[in-house]
């Protein structure tokens, strides 16, 4: 079990094996780890930092930085590549994947977030899709 706490470096330098027939799903409340934003900023790419600074609302910027930082940390523990060294390629819809040179593991991942909630799924040798939506109460008529 990997614990996420205020010392996020406890989370780094770990290794998790993903079996060929396994699916790993990670769920996070981004607001509960927003205090780690400065540490996450240090592992983001320049492009990710530019994108983060385009958000109008600070809470959206913080959530973006935390979600990308978490994605990089998770990819690092599956691949052994440093969090900062992870490089992405994007499909025509903007979905990220590891560049081919870094993906000798046939690792596939997908992430989704809604407000403060983020979910990331990982598989080997198969595509994966995850989707989360926060439920909104129905109005009484």
Residue ranges, per PLM feature:
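Core catalytic alpha/beta fold that binds nucleotide/phospho-ligands
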Residues: 1-141
């Amino acid at each position: 079990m990997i614990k996420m706490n205020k010392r996020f470096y406890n989370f780094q330098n770990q290794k998790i094996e993903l079996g060929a027939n396994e699916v790993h799903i990670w769920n996070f409340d981004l607001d509960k780890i927003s205090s780690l934003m400065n540490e996450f900023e240090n592992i983001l790419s320049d492009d990710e930092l530019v994108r983060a600074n385009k958000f109008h609302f600070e809470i959206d910027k913080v959530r973006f930085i935390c979600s990308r930082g978490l994605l990089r940390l998770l990819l690092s523990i599956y691949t052994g590549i440093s969090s900062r060294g992870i490089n992405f390629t994007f499909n025509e819809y903007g979905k990220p994947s590891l560049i081919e040179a870094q993906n000798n593991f046939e690792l596939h991942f997908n992430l989704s977030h809604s407000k403060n909630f983020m979910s990331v799924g990982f598989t080997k040798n198969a595509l994966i899709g995850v989707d989360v939506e926060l439920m909104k109460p129905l109005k009484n008529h």
